[in-house]
Amino acid sequence: MFQTFRNAWKIPELKNRLLFTLAILVVYRLGCAIPVPFVSGSALTQMFANGDMLSYLNMMSGGALARCTLFALGVTPYINASIIVQLLTVAIPALENLAKEADGQQKLQQINRYAGAVVALIMSIGYYFVIRNMGALKHISGAAGVFAAVVIIATFVAGAQLITWAGEQIDDKGIGNGISLLIFASIVSNWSSLYTSVTGLLTRAAAGEPQFYILLPVLVILALVAVVFVVVMTNAERRITIQYAKRVVGRKQMGGQNSYLPLKLNMSGVMPIIFASALVSIPGTIGSFLQIDQTAHPVWYAFFHTFNYTSWLYVVIYLLLILAFNYFYVAIQYNPVEIANNLRRNNGSIPGFRPGKPTSDFITRTLNKITLIGAIFLAAVAVLPIILGNLTGMSIQLGGTSLLIVVGVALDTTRSLDSFMTMRNHKGFLG
């Protein structure tokens, strides 16, 4: 492993990409510490200590939302905009045709940026009224109040757009997926709270509750098992054997070898988790923004409170969204008919199946089975911690989501590094 890192550092292009990625991540974390003007961040601490839906947004921003800093909105506007654009791409034929054009993805990315700016503006206005209702503003009336509102909202929007730009820069000049790495950095930066949780368990054990001495190592073992399980399932794949017919080109005989078509168990990666979390958090976040009083509006309070982590309806909706987004992502990423046509053009075939429709039907059936298993895996890892949290009363609802994101992003980044190493005839991270 250490020799691999040394070899990676000897490749100038890879070294520059690594340094650039690290520099962007450092700038991102610095932006998460720059306070927004005219706001008292200490007044917002209690609002984020209640474990409601704002906790999810705070996790995605690396704690910047609770501190009301430049990057308070995090990557959430970009993610929500991506959901909207991708759903519209499937629903609107013009956008679907645009996606198939040579420069279609660049145009869709531009639409994504504009949509992200609109979502960021809406969220900024909502968050402004939240901090105003919490009494965290230094100016709320007169010309000073208007000026403060404009500066605060503009700062939030600018921060969100800067994060989007930073993610795209990592995509172009760095290593790995930019937005995913920013989410990774946000989640890891919040893991310092694990120390507080551990010391809390030890304190309760020392105070006369010895069962927590047993609970702590059990939780550690479960966490390690969960990490191993996620790594194994993320790397698992179904390999379909491909045979290529022999053909003569000039005086040389080409083809005749066997290969395989890899179908990963978790093809969609962590995106279904991220998208489902972002989507299911919208009603609860709106409820937090509106600060609805239970006595004055009991119906609306009950409706928005339904989308809290402690609600079983939230668990069901979250589960269904993960399943739906997993199938949706696989459907737009893999086209069995196109794969079958490519095999036919290259004189390839799957043993036991004729080229054309029989081949595409077999790939479709195999893909559906794998997608179901992958969707159940994602849903189980994401939902089980929430269920355990509801049953035990412990605040571990973000554990499954954050674990999947961190492990998934780490593996994807490792693969990117490995591909660079392999192309330059060095031994990669993955062997």
Predicted feature descriptions by range:
Residues 1-99, 103-431:
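N-terminal cationic and glycine-rich segments that engage phosphates or anionic surfaces
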